[in-house]
Amino acid sequence: MFLARLTRHGIHPGLDSIGRVLSGFNNPQFSFPAVQVAGTNGKGTTAVILAALFRSAGFRTGLFTSPHLVDVRERIQIDGQLLDPTSFLTCLRDACRVQERLGLSLTFFEMLTVVGFLAFERASVDIAILEVGLGGRWDATSTARPDVSVLTSVAKDHTEILGETLEKILREKAAIGRVGKPFIATFPDHLRDEWSLIEKKRGFLSVLRGREFDGAWASPELLGKRSFIYQGRAEKKVFQTALVARYQLNNLLSAMAVLEYGPWKIPDEVIASALPTLRNPGRWERLPSFPVILDGAHNPESMRELVEQIREAFPDPERVGFLAGFIKGKDWEEMLGILPEAGRTFFLTAPPDTDAVDPLQLASFMGVRKGCSFSVGQFDSMSVNAFEWSGQVPGRILVVTGSLYLVGAVKRWQSGETSPLSAGERNVFSSFHP
């Protein structure tokens, strides 16, 4: 398959190559309205929420998101369904031909972005929800012209590309804003002055959490549901949702603000019927047959949010265990150092087929932690041991975290599925880490 032959080009500091390939198809990215969602954390969940709400309202909806957990086609969905294999391969071959004719070499992410745009145009979608892969300014999805932009959070991640300070990271992410278009944004208060400078320069219309919209949880979780309050321009509104983790509140509020301040109107009753059925795999996802939660937190801020959620839902750390593994280049020491606040038992491993941190390094780090027990080993053995531990005593809970690639591997292992990708394809995919 062509994707397996892509080399590790990394990030192109510009949009010229993908722009030329898209021009070869008469710019399919301009054929549909779009919402573009950026953010250090929460952008994927917000994109999933928006896609579900538009779909429930009768819009033919495209969703472009990343990374995938099991099947690469998870990244390109139409009306909640993975792009069918025939359409995927057709779009991929077409993109490959144009790329080769132009003598260009797209990255893995750029190629899939072209495939997504072609698929959405050919399916005549009414709207596309586009999750930014990395940053914003030079992200392949920024070749589109979104009607609404969203920024879900700003924290330190990918600093070697985006910059070492929050101000630099904000500038990269806020570059997705469009002149005269709403920009729904959440970021730390101390960045307000920097944001104002960017707003004046780029000319977008700011819709800020804490100013134009806000909200709060209205109830604790009960039977897998939780209520939240949304406050926009009008009266407060209360909705129930199946996304119950405390850190998911901002994602829900951001999606609600898109519907209020964007050009589309979806009735409250449609929203109220859709939110209780929402699911977002790999983010506070409970397995149905095991006391196991999957959460792909993969940077210090998202890990702190996960720990707060665990402590709220499962306050006894002696009953909480972790199956954890991390990708090189991430601040794994800070992440692993946070976890003992919520649990005491650790199964340390490496996400398979990735450039992972050696589990022995994790063990060495954990060795100085008092009050914690840990074991270390290959993925299969640690998964078996961790799942067995979770079922030995009633009330125990196992949390799988550290990388979305680890979460995806557990989903395949737990369901008995083998990867639908060849070893070569997995190696290519592993160079683009969540």
Q: Where in the sequence are the language-model features?
A:
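Charged, amphipathic alpha-helical linker segments immediately N-terminal to NTP-binding catalytic cores
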Residues: 1-9
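ATP-dependent carboxylate-amine ligase
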Residues: 3, 144-145, 167, 264, ...
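ATP-dependent carboxylate-amine ligase catalytic core
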Residues: 15, 19-30, 56-144, 160-162, ...
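Beta-strand->loop->alpha-helix junctions that form or flank phosphate-binding loops
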Residues: 64, 184-187, 198-222, 241-246, ...
